[in-house]
Each structure stands twice: as structure tokens, then as C-alpha cells.
Amino acid sequence: MISLIEKAPYIPYPLALYEKLEQRHTLLFESAEIESKAHTKSLLMAKACLKLVCNHNIVTITSLTPNGGAFLQTLSAFFKTPIQDNALTLTYTKDKKIQDEFLKLFEPSPFDALRGLFKSVKTRPKHPFTLFSAGVFSFEMLNFFEDLPHLKANDNTANDFIFYVAQNLIIIDHKEKSAEILGACFDERFKTEIAKELQDLKELVKNIKSDFIPKKAKQSIEVSVSCDDSEFEKKVLFLQEEIKKGEIFQAVLSRSFYMECLEGLSAYYHLKLSNPSPYMFYIKDSDFILFGASPESALKYNALTNTAEIYPIAGTRLRGKDKQGNIDYDLDSKMEFDLQHDYKERAEHIMLVDLARNDMARVSKKRYCDKLLKVDKYSNVMHLVSRVVGELKKGCDSLHAYRSFMNAGTLSGAPKISAIKLIYQLENQRRGSYGGSVGYLNSEGSMDSCITIRSCFVKNNRAVIQAGAGIVLDSVPQNEANETRAKVQALIDAIRKTIS
């Protein structure tokens, strides 16, 4: 593999740049600091050369460009599998004889297809993003590893995972005010062509002088919901009975809100403007659009330090606002104090921090928790947060850590598998991207991902916005229903701002 790197002028308008490049199999990842809300970094996949799709135990790898076809040939040799119809099809079977929880992490799985991307090629020159793969893990990715029922499809039709390999990647560092463009070349024959693509991108960057201008469209403002408050509250009561029986301690029950969405990119613009978050993303597939502003890290792994971290978020309050909808700082401080000293919220949060520590223990030599019970604030809500860090055991990589963590206790419950079985019973349909993760893997071996919450899945101009609430014995059913509405409000507002 040959890596091409071009320095480019700094551009403070990543969304305006993405608008010029928006097509199928592209994505934009952005990040903002929680405290200052200042933007820190943007990653823009301008062109993908491969697409990987997982459906339960089958992974299909398809080339999207001639250069991707060359990489597919390399992968064919690596996996010892022939190419048919411009694609590789890999099938994985669980080894049910393995009982040891640590050894189970190393059984064959669809994650091996992602590992193969990086094991099959040697990168030169060395750059952390020489080879870059990014995409989505669904909530139901867990079903391959655990004995869980298969559910009917939801409007959120995201596969178990969908990942792309970048042919052209633009990296913008907003702190350093720098930019670079990377090209991944898998055959000498395509070097000149990819070098030209990088020069064209460089010219495009130079010519963008102003920010993205959002568009509007005529569409309905109506919002519908998968289950109304009354039905949701009955499900809360059912879970509380299961808690009394000792089946679970906590479960995260969710519901979906639906509305029309004709201008996804403009809705994303309004969302990130009102709700700058550590993880902001816009993904355009051939089948759907997924965008969001997630406050919660799924798994962050630094290959250089061999450390993984999880950022549990559990415990929510509305922001303190006046009648005009502006932040009332005295009221906001009272809400923050109330959240930090609420026995129910603290107990729920500590339980999920303990679950995160247990997940980390499976793959780490040592671990610790810092930032315990800190408060992060967003446009409509504030959350209790903590950070769990661990140094991975020998032989473990980012995907072993993700497997151990999947799915986040803050989106499932405790004990995790028992809670998920009850969630499946009550929700009775796939969550798809909701509660899974969005993230990337790079050639350094590092991974960064967020839990797919505060997100919107759009297919055929229909938006699915899903949100959940953590149910414990002390939960007040109406309050939990209200919490789901509070969590989706920023997305509903963002879409409504695109309506003419």
C-alpha cells in the first residue's frame, strides 16, 4: 500500500466542504470540547474504495473503485476466499465449545473481517490515518456473540455493521489550524489518479470561503411515536416487577419518534450549532443517512499507550431555562445540584460505572475510574458522567475491548444480557444503529467511537429518532417517558428548522 499525503490550507468550514463532496459512501466526523464547545477536529471521508457489510455471521466486502478492487484482490489472498461479483463473502461460525469468558474474545467472528483490513497490508510512509476505516455498529451486533432472539426489522434498518475504507480522507485540526489530505493507493497503477484526486481536493479546500448555508423544504411538522406515554409507562411498571423479582437491577427502555426529513445535511447543521458535542457525525450510505451529536464515548483505544476508556453517562436533568427558553444560570445551577445529590440518579450511575469497570476487567490488566459523577451540559439536558480507563492485556486489541464492552450498560442495563432480553421482549423490534456505535479504526491500531444516541436515521425521507430511559425500582413512569422526549427534542428542533 502507498500512502499519499498533501498539506492543505486550513479550512474552518468542514460542513461547507462536505456539501461539495456529499455522495454515497461518504462521511463527516466532527468533535467539540464539552466545556468550551470549541471545535477540535474534523475527519472527512471524501471517497470510499471498499464497503463492508455484516449481517449476523456473514460479512460482504465490496469494491467501490478500481483502487478498491486492487485492495479486494489483496484481501482475497489474505482470507483465502475467491472474489465473486466484485465482492468477497466471509462466513463466521462461533465455537460453542469455548466456555472461558476471556478466551471467547478470540473466537472467530465478523470482527476478523475488520482486523483483516489492517493485517493484510503494510503501510508506508507511517501515518496514523494511512489506512482509515469508519462506520456503524448496530445494537444487534451483539446477537452474533450471545444467545439472543432475532427480532423483526425496524424502520432503522442499519445492518449489524457497515464500514467503509477511505480512498481520500481530509483531516482538519481546528486547534492547530491545519489540514491535510490523505490518499490510500493499493496498486501502483492508480497512484497518478489518486494524486490527481488529492490535488483536486486541495483546490476545492482553497476555494471555500464561507460557511455552509442551510436549506429549507416544504414538509410536515408532525411527530409520531412508536408507543404513547401510557403504553411506555406500562412497560416501565413491567420492568419494575422484574426488578422486584430479582431478574435485573436496571434496564434501558426506549421508544422511537418519527417525522419527515427532507434536508438531512441542514438538519445536522442546526443540531451541531445548538448542541456541539464530543462526537458529531454525518454518514451518507447508499441506503440511508445517519447523523447525530452524541455526548457519550462508546470505546476509545489509544494503541500507543495501550489504554482503553469508557465514558458512562447516566442521570439526566433538563437545563434551567427562563420563559423565553434562555439559560437561567441560577436555576441551571440548582438543577445541577439536584442532579448530583439525587439518590436515585447517583445509585443508578454508580451501578453502571461498576458495570463498565467489570466490562473493562475482562480485557485489562489494571483499571481505574476518574471524573466520577461529573456533570456535562448540553442544549436541553445535563448528564452525570464518569470515566473508566484500563490498560489492555497482552494479545487484546480495540475490537476485543469493544466486544467486551458491547453493548453499553447505559443503553442496556444490568445484568446486561438479562436486561437486553427484556428489552427485546418489550420493544419487539431491532434498534438498528440506536444504542450501537459510530466510529473509526486506523492504521496505528487505535479506535475512537461514540454510542449512537442523540441521532437520527433517515431512509426514504423518513426520520427515526430513538431515545431511552434507565428504569430502576424507584423510577416514576411518567418522568421516564418525559425523559425520552427531552432527549429527542434537540433533533426534532433541528429538523423543524429546515421546514419552510
UniProtKB/Swiss-Prot annotation:
GO molecular function: anthranilate synthase activity; metal ion binding
Keyword Phosphoprotein set for record: no
Binding site for Mg(2+): 348, 483
Cofactor(s) needed for function: Mg(2+)
Annotated L-tryptophan binding sites: 31, 278-280
Pathway: Amino-acid biosynthesis; L-tryptophan biosynthesis; L-tryptophan from chorismate: step 1/5
Keyword Magnesium: yes
Cofactor note (record): Binds 1 Mg(2+) ion per subunit.
Gene3D superfamilies attached to this UniProt entry: Anthranilate synthase
Subunit structure: Heterotetramer consisting of two non-identical subunits: a beta subunit (TrpG) and a large alpha subunit (TrpE).
Family: Belongs to the anthranilate synthase component I family.
Function of the protein: Part of a heterotetrameric complex that catalyzes the two-step biosynthesis of anthranilate, an intermediate in the biosynthesis of L-tryptophan. In the first step, the glutamine-binding beta subunit (TrpG) of anthranilate synthase (AS) provides the glutamine amidotransferase activity which generates ammonia as a substrate that, along with chorismate, is used in the second step, catalyzed by the large alpha subunit of AS (TrpE) to produce anthranilate. In the absence of TrpG, TrpE can synthesize anthranilate directly from chorismate and high concentrations of ammonia.
Name of the protein in question: Anthranilate synthase component 1
Organism: Helicobacter pylori (strain J99 / ATCC 700824) (Campylobacter pylori J99)
